[in-house]
């Protein structure tokens, strides 16, 4: 296909250069200086001063060598180290603590509530977990209304609590005091498993009075205002952490990285506690576990221009027109939120250069955000020679003047842009795998872009094999509903750890009691033996010292106690 496209592109470049020369000559013949009047064509169709562009030049910009990808991996790894040391002030990869100390081990059981606020949707779920069985789930879905997304924090959390209460009341469990796990998929500075301060809103939220506040406290205050439900919020997690935990549950307890590739991208992995300087410096309670899941927040990589060498001119155009220019750079490169718009900008450039559609675009094609990312998946699903979806999409864009080679070129643009995203995502995953460095590593992946793009998973796996260090083995596990299942499973892990810690405390108390009893018996025996042999002592002021730790004072012997030492007198 690429050979045909190359031939087609060369022919078009030659033909279009002749056409541009004819138009230019016509312009001078008529004495017209206004480009918009050339041959009756509007400015949106082409400009004489456009730099040369072809499919080859586009592909050259989006093609990243493994050398470039490894350079990016090295920069990411250094930023991860800086994030562990100093957090978001020190690095564009924040490396935020989750305070989740373990993965599920298969013994979790109980009934739990999970809430998932991600994007513009809210889900409330009731999950029954039993060892060795599939999770049983009942759920309620709703869309967050625009007034809540752009209103006050009190309005937003009151709406969330309203949905929770209605679900619990419908199930008749509003007074059962069930534990709640809350998946809150926005960057938070976490201070414990149930305390997290929102750093910034993403995904279209502009709710006031939440940034800088403790999200769990806001939810609990809203629950208290209602007063008609009884629950306990025990964990607040990120969707990436939930994906990692859900993947571990599916794979029998093993998952080394959790990855989201949806509208944006993020990852989590298990890190040694000794390396988590920033996260533990703000902890509100002692953390007594050897490991912790880290929420990398790698979507911000590049926000300080440290990754400019992987940006194309099209990425820069899309970023400059975005809602938050210069923010979440890696999100925009890998996730689906901007992928369609990048393709559209490329198509617009090719059209204006008369490489595509004979230079005749449409108002829709030249309108920002008119080419959603789902178009890419639909175009690439077309079977060879059919192009049913491609024709439908061109119709939706108001383009009816296209050739077979136009459809081939459109498809190839979708390939080069989305494959670049897959390669960057693979490089980021490989960076973490090379840091974790364990055998037979499991990567749990969730997200709409990864799931619904027909080739994305294959491209990620293919590139990973080239970038992961030799000798390291890995497996990709596509995980369904990590944000929902993960929240319930983490709540179950908390319950399991609570039981385990209580049991350990009881065992320690029993061991201490047994030790005390043994010491007491030894002292009593020594006292009895000493009293029975007092006549053997010739010197009335001789004393026997028995070291007694943690034993009560006895009144049944003759002697003194000083600094924990019993002095038994031999006086008659």
Swiss-Prot record:
pH dependence: Optimum pH is 8.4.
Phylogenetic classification of the source organism: Eukaryota, Metazoa, Ecdysozoa, Nematoda, Chromadorea
Residues at which D-glucose 6-phosphate binds: 116-120, 185, 239, 263, 446-448, 483
Protein name in the entry: Hexokinase
GO biological process: glucose metabolic process; glycolytic process; hexose metabolic process; intracellular glucose homeostasis
Region (Hexokinase large subdomain) location: 238-481
Broadest EC class assigned to this enzyme: transferase
Physiological role: Active against glucose, fructose, mannose, maltose and galactose.
Keyword Membrane: no
Organism: Brugia malayi
One Pfam short name: Hexokinase_1
Residues reported to bind ATP: 116-121, 263, 336-337, 373-377, 448-452
């Amino acid at each position: 296909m690429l050979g045909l496209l190359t031939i087609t592109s060369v022919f078009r470049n030659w033909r279009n250069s002749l056409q541009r020369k004819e138009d230019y000559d016509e312009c001078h013949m008529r004495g017209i200086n206004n480009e918009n009047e050339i041959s009756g064509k509007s400015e949106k169709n082409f400009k004489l001063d456009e730099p040369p562009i072809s499919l080859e030049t586009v592909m050259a910009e989006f093609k990243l060598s493994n050398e470039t990808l490894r350079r990016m991996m090295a920069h990411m790894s250094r930023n991860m180290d800086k994030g562990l040391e100093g957090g978001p002030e020190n690095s564009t990869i924040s490396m935020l603590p989750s305070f989740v100390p373990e993965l599920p081990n298969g013994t979790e059981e109980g009934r739990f509530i999970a809430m998932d606020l991600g994007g513009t949707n809210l889900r409330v779920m009731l999950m029954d977990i039993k060892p060795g069985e599939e999770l049983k789930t009942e759920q309620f879905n709703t869309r967050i209304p625009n007034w809540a997304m752009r209103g006050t924090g009190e309005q937003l959390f009151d709406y969330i609590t309203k949905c929770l209460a209605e679900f619990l009341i419908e199930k008749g469990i509003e007074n059962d005091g069930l534990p709640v796990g809350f998946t809150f998929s926005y960057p938070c500075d976490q201070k414990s498993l149930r305390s997290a301060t929102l750093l910034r809103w993403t995904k279209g939220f502009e709710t006031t009075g939440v940034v800088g506040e403790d999200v769990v406290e806001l939810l609990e205050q809203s629950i208290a205002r209602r007063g008609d439900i009884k629950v306990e919020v025990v964990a607040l997690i990120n969707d990436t952490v939930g994906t990692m935990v859900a993947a571990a549950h599916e794979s029998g307890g093993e998952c080394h990285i959790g990855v989201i590739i949806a509208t944006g991208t993020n990852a989590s992995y298990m890190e040694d506690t000794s390396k988590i300087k920033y996260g533990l410096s703000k902890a509100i309670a002692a953390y007594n576990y050897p490991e912790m899941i880290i929420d990398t927040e790698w979507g911000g990589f590049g926000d300080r221009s440290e990754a400019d060498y992987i940006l194309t001119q099209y990425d820069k155009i899309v970023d400059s027109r975005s809602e938050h220019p210069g923010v979440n750079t890696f999100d925009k490169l890998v996730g689906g939120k901007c992928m369609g718009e990048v393709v559209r900008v490329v198509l617009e450039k090719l059209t204006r250069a008369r490489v595509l559609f004979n230079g005749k675009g449409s108002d829709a094609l030249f309108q920002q955000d008119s080419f959603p990312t789902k178009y890419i998946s639909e175009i690439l699903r077309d079977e060879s020679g059919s192009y049913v979806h491609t024709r439908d999409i061109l119709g939706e864009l108001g383009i009816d003047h296209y050739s077979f080679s136009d459809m081939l070129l459109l498809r190839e643009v979708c390939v080069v842009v989305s494959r670049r995203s897959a390669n960057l995502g693979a490089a980021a995953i490989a960076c973490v795998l090379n840091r974790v460095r364990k055998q037979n590593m499991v990567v749990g992946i969730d997200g709409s872009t990864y799931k619904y793009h027909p080739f994305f998973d294959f491209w990620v796996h293919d590139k990973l094999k080239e970038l992961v260090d030799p000798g390291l083995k890995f497996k990709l596990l596509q995980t369904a509903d990590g944000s929902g299942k993960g929240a319930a499973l983490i709540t179950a892990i908390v319950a399991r750890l609570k039981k385990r810690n209580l049991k350990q405390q009881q065992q320690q108390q029993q061991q201490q009691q047994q030790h005390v009893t043994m010491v007491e018996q030894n002292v009593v025996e020594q006292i009895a033996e000493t009293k029975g042999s007092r006549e053997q002592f010739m010197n009335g002021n001789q004393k026997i010292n028995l070291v007694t730790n943690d034993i009560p004072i006895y009144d049944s012997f003759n002697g003194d106690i000083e600094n924990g030492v019993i002095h038994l007198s031999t006086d008659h």
